[in-house]
Amino acid sequence: MVNVPKTKKTYCKSKECRKHTLHKVTQYKKGKDSLAAQGKRRYDRKQSGYGGQTKPVFHKKAKTTKKIVLRLQCQGCKHVSQHPIKRCKHFEIGGDKKGKGTSLF
């Protein structure tokens, strides 16, 4: 279980700041796929009509987790940077802090 605080003081690379400032931490989420992308248009055109599935469907999935990407937004200039961390099955932002010699459960 990885627990990350909601704010982090780290270096901001934007031209306005260029110093250590407080950043708001959120988790990166994949955006919605565009229907106008060239590959999607080509795929839809190929799929239309008779003939079933025209391209191979991938089944040999190897990974059980994804790498967590933190989205850091500077509270001074609103500049956003991304910071990948290790793979984990359980991830939370701003959860209860674990004290010394105690368990969360």
UniProtKB/Swiss-Prot annotation:
Chain spans, region Disordered: 28-57
GO BP term, pick one: translation
Molecular functions (GO terms): structural constituent of ribosome
GO cellular component: cytosolic large ribosomal subunit
UniProtKB keywords: Ribonucleoprotein, Ribosomal protein
KW Ribosomal protein (keyword) present: yes
Similarity field: Belongs to the eukaryotic ribosomal protein eL42 family.
Name of the protein described by the UniProt record: Large ribosomal subunit protein eL42
Taxonomic source organism: Gossypium hirsutum
Gene: RPL44
